[in-house]
Amino acid sequence: MVLQRIKIPKLLVKPVGRAIADFSMIRDGDRVLLAVSGGKDSLSLFHILRHFQRHAPINFDLGVVTIDPEVEGFEPQALESFFQRFETPYFFEEFPIMEQAKQSMKGDSYCSFCARIKRGLMYQVARRENYNVLALGQHLDDLAESLMMSMCHNGKIQTMKAHYVNDAKDIRIIRPLVYVRERQLASFAQELKLPVIADSCPACFSMPTEREHFKQWLLSEEQRTPNLYKNLLSAMKPMLDEVND
């Protein structure tokens, strides 16, 4: 696969470019570490960020990190060779997250525990390799689902941030896909035949998640209200930026 031959659809370039500009996500001289699980979202974001490396009026470095939770069925070997073809720095970290969860998890969901452990490991890699920005692949559907979960279960109107700083104040976290729909990414990944790794988390298979429940509810509601996600984005936008408030 040759980068110059990959055409990124305007339906992806425009919303990602607008999000990067709206929230000042990437600045000249930044070193951006992209978290890649092997899913369609993060792999698509890799190509989009490479596009902006070539065409944006700023210069930034791009590296990739994968956290292997050491669960049966997760086979990330194809990712290393994939990123080698683009001469992209690739960092691979292993950690027995499920085993750790059995010993240490208290009053939390597996998904929340796993996300917290992975985030800590990614911060370690970013510091060790001198990256100041961590890019994550959540999209508009994810933000809408988080909003509904927070309102219904916690009584709070909040969702994931598009841009914020970690507690240690040394790494900025960005989500360039906040204006992009999941189905757009699925179509792009399929068209490019990206080496997508299927979700193999046993916790997700053993119990339906609340996120999946709200995902299906929102998609069903969208059939009745075609502008649903556009309206939800308008409602969420004031709460998405922590860095530039």
Positions of predicted regions on the chain:
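Short C-terminal domain-edge/linker segments immediately following a structured domain
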Residues: F92-M98, Q124, Y164-K169, M207-E210, ...
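An accessory alpha-helical subdomain
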Residues: W217-L240
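Catalytic subdomain that performs nucleotidyl-dependent activation
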Residues: D141-S220
